[in-house]
């Protein structure tokens, strides 16, 4: 068993052959510290592992495959109102008959949710929308066109 003790003093008292390390081999290699690196973690350094690195061994959790991670496919009415100007500049939304027309399905959104406020008349084309979202859009003078899902 390795004896845990402080390293010897670095004060060299006189120029000697071994500088306070006894026989020549005693300061050579890695025997005095119990091995290089992580050697002995499951053996003679186990008490160190238990105290300072309890999660050193074993598997912890998992990485979910990205194919199953759902992308953010909902948008709130408030977010929609904030993004309208940028979408008009980019050409994603159009101005028709005094209303801004936005196709959320083409932008990758699957559902319109009712959180937030909207004051401008908007025609929104979307696969699904909540009752509250439809009510808020209609109160602002707009309309919601819900696409029929295939299948």
Swiss-Prot record:
Alphabetic keyword roster: Ribonucleoprotein, Ribosomal protein, RNA-binding, rRNA-binding
HAMAP family in the cross-refs: Ribosomal_uL15
Highest taxon, organism lineage: Archaea
Segment forming the signal sequence: none
Species for this entry: Hyperthermus butylicus (strain DSM 5456 / JCM 9403 / PLM1-5)
GO cellular component: cytosolic large ribosomal subunit
Encoding gene per record: rpl15
Assembly mode: Part of the 50S ribosomal subunit.
InterPro entries on file: Rbsml_uL15_N, Ribosomal_uL15, Ribosomal_uL15/eL18, Ribosomal_uL15/eL18_sf, Ribosomal_uL15_CS
Pfam families: Ribosomal_L27A
Function comment: Binds to the 23S rRNA.
The protein's name: Large ribosomal subunit protein uL15
Keyword check for Ribonucleoprotein: yes
Similarity comment: Belongs to the universal ribosomal protein uL15 family.
GO annotation terms (biological process): translation
GO MF terms, alphabetically ordered: rRNA binding; structural constituent of ribosome
């Amino acid at each position: 068993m390795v004896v845990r003790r402080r390293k010897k003093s670095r004060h060299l008292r006189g120029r000697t052959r071994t500088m306070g390390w006894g026989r020549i081999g005693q300061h050579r290699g890695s025997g005095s510290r119990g091995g290089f690196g992580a050697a002995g973690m499951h053996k003679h350094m186990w008490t160190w592992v238990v105290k300072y690195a309890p999660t050193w061994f074993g598997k912890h959790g998992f990485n979910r495959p990205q194919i199953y991670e759902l992308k953010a496919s909902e948008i709130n009415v408030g977010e929609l109102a904030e993004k309208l100007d940028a979408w008009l500049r980019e050409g994603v939304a159009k101005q028709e008959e005094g209303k801004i027309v936005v196709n959320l399905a083409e932008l990758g959104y699957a559902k319109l949710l009712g959180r937030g406020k909207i004051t401008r008349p908007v025609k929104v084309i979307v696969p699904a929308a909540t009752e509250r979202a439809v009510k808020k859009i209609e109160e602002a003078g707009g309309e919601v066109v819900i696409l029929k899902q295939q299948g």
